[in-house]
């Protein structure tokens, strides 16, 4: 607020995942675990999971058991905690706050539209994910969620070094404009165009 020069704000944590009805339990499990293994910090860690109301209770129990074995702390909204007392009750202010620890909170939603609205209200808006078998759902999510990066059926895990080894990433920006998304050394520079002619047009 008191900066006298342009500021490029980076974001960390509080990334959301929407688990669509009838989509892969194993993919959800793998994406959550992998996202928390970012180096050196959990920049894109999935900390909040929105679950379609029609999800099978047995699938939830399998997921939670697996995450518990990996050392995760699990929380849920009031509806989930009432049905599954092993979950800790989430506080309202936590929906918009990053944990930056191995903590994941779960919430039931009625539809994809509800999930998109919730994510746009509470997410850090730099990396959000969806697991779905529907191309239409994936497109609706990608176009509807106001985040710098959208991950469809793939882990949002952050790595300082790109897979091609050409770029070093310093973080993720959720600011709107051309400096949104991955922050690299190139992001911190600008360009200058020099046009030379011989007087002919």
Q: What is each of the regions a protein language model found here?
A:
Residues 96-103, 122-126, 148-149:
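Conserved glycine-rich beta-strand-loop-beta hairpin in the small C-terminal domain of fold type I
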Residues 25, 111-112, 135:
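Residues at or immediately preceding the N-termini of alpha-helices
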Residues 40-46, 73-79, 127-133, 151-155, ...:
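Flexible, glycine/charged-enriched surface loops at secondary-structure junctions
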Residues 133-201:
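C-terminal segments
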Residues 1-98:
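ALDH superfamily catalytic-core signature
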Residues 50-51, 101-110, 125-130:
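Short, well-ordered beta-strand elements within core beta-sheets of diverse protein domains
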Residues 2-5, 64-69, 120-124, 144-147, ...:
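Short, solvent-exposed amphipathic alpha-helical segments in soluble enzyme
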């Amino acid at each position: 607020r008191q900066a006298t020069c342009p500021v490029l704000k980076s974001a960390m944590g509080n990334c959301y995942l929407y688990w669509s009805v009838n989509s892969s339990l194993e993919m959800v499990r793998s994406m959550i675990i992998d996202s928390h293994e970012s180096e050196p910090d959990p920049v894109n860690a999935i900390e909040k999971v929105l679950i379609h109301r029609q999800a099978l209770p047995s699938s939830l129990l399998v997921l939670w058991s697996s995450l518990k074995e990996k050392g995760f702390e699990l929380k849920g909204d009031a509806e989930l905690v009432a049905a599954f007392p092993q979950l800790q009750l989430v506080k309202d202010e936590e929906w918009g706050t990053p944990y930056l620890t191995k903590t994941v909170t779960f919430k039931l939603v009625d539809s994809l539209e509800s999930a998109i609205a919730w994510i746009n209200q509470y997410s850090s808006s730099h990396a959000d994910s969806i697991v779905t078998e529907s191309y239409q759902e994936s497109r609706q999510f990608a176009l509807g969620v106001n985040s710098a990066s959208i991950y469809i059926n793939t882990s949002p895990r952050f790595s300082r070094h790109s897979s091609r080894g050409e770029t070093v990433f310093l973080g993720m920006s959720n600011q709107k404009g051309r400096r949104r998304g991955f922050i690299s050394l190139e992001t911190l520079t600008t360009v200058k165009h020099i046009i030379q002619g011989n007087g002919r047009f």
